[in-house]
Curated annotation (Swiss-Prot):
The keyword Glycosyltransferase does not apply. It holds the Pfam family Cytochrome_B. It is found in: Mitochondrion inner membrane. This is Cytochrome b. It comes from Rhinolophus pumilus. The gene is MT-CYB. CDD domains: cytochrome_b_C, Cytochrome_b_N.
Length: 379
């Protein structure tokens, strides 16, 4: 009699994906973030579901329903801060996951990579709409500023903005539809994650050397399940420390003021995980140009596989590319800092230089460094 996990139609899928899955023997902790992202998504869906049971998506009561959750609902404050800081954890894991993909050349799995980019866009859209729901000052003005960017699209822009708003300004209709979409999108993301994994398991995982590891595979369980549990424990410790000791550390104080269309906050800025893209948007004086740069700041990831000129897959043995990669990381941190600063000298010029450098590294310097490394190998 065969083992039920290998014969049962449903268990067999789980077994082939998480138990008997052949995995490279050399993958490091940088490969933990996929499973951590899965946990983050589950935490967000669960906490979000319970928050939605108490939340009201009406402009008159939305802010007070969130206050009610924190004050009157049993452990409502834990749910609220787990959900808010869980989003930050989600993006930390996302950025590290994408960074790992760039460093080790995982982008050569083009289907997996492209679905990952669509997932990144979907998660960013979900987070943006979630930020609007508490209906504080930054929620309202963030929604107004970001949705208003659509008006930069020639010919159909103004109509499109009013269609998204459901009126002539951000109001009740906007809040209601954002709540509906914010609730729906995580389930679409979950389905896309399954497709992401499906394509990954067609090729198998990459490894730090970038060399095919078909000759040296080990079962996912117990080796990588225990390794993933270690990563999970560390992430949960970080998340719970944030939630229980400094829940408002990454938030904006302006969001504790109810939304007021007649009073604009001095500095409108999104959550920290969007600041790098926001800095790129602001560094271009033209509205349409800024919107195009904003979209391209993420979409540029889709071009990386096409610009892979190196004879090696991974950056492990490519010092020039490594230098450029860490320069890119430093540049993104600079952009994140600039995105949170007011639009004045010297922040404007720093933001513009950092934005140029961002695209220059990815589109020009990295492919050139790879060509140089190919020539150095011949010596």
């Amino acid at each position: 009699m065969t083992n039920i996990r290998k014969s049962h139609p449903l268990f067999k899928i789980i077994n082939d994906s998480f138990i008997d899955l052949p995995a490279p023997s050399s993958i490091s902790s940088w490969w933990n973030f996929g499973s951590l992202l899965g946990v983050c998504l589950a935490v967000q869906i669960l906490t979000g579901l319970f928050l939605a049971m108490h939340y009201t998506s009406d402009t008159a009561t939305a802010f007070y329903s969130v206050t009610h959750i924190c004050r009157d609902v049993n452990y409502g404050w834990v749910l609220r801060y787990l959900h808010a800081n869980g989003a930050s954890m989600f993006f930390i894991c996302l950025f590290l996951h994408v960074g790992r993909g760039i460093y080790y050349g995982s982008y050569t799995f083009s289907e997996t990579w492209n679905i990952g980019i669509i997932l990144l866009f979907a998660v960013m859209a979900t987070a943006f709409m979630g930020y609007v729901l508490p209906w504080g000052q930054m929620s309202f003005w963030g929604a107004t500023v970001i949705t208003n960017l659509l008006s930069a699209i020639p010919y159909i822009g103004t109509t499109l903005v009013e269609w998204v708003w459901g009126g002539f300004s951000v109001d009740k209709a906007t809040l209601t539809r954002f709540f509906a979409l914010h609730f729906l999108l995580p389930f679409i993301i979950s389905a896309m994650v399954m497709v992401h994994l499906l394509f990954l398991h067609e090729t198998g995982s990459n490894n730090p050397t970038g060399i095919p590891s078909d000759v040296d595979m080990i079962p996912f369980h117990p080796y990588y399940t225990i390794k993933d549990i270690l990563g999970l424990v560390l992430m949960l410790m970080a998340l719970l420390s944030l939630v229980l000791f400094a829940p408002d550390l990454l938030g904006d104080p302006d969001n504790y003021t109810p939304a007021n269309p007649l009073n604009t906050p001095p500095h409108i800025k999104p959550e920290w995980y969007f600041l790098f893209a926001y800095a790129i948007l602001r560094s271009i004086p033209n509205k349409l140009g800024g919107v195009v740069a904003l979209v391209l700041s993420i979409l540029v990831l889709a071009v990386i596989p096409l610009l892979h000129t190196s004879k090696q897959r991974s950056m492990t043995f490519r010092p020039l590319s490594q230098c450029l990669f860490w320069l890119l990381v430093a540049d993104l941190l600079t952009l994140t800092w600039i995105g949170g600063q007011p639009v004045e000298h010297p922040f404007i010029i720093i933001g513009q230089l950092a934005s140029i450098l961002y695209f220059l590294i990815i589109l020009v310097l990295m492919p050139l460094a790879s060509i140089a490394e190919n020539h150095l190998l011949k010596w």
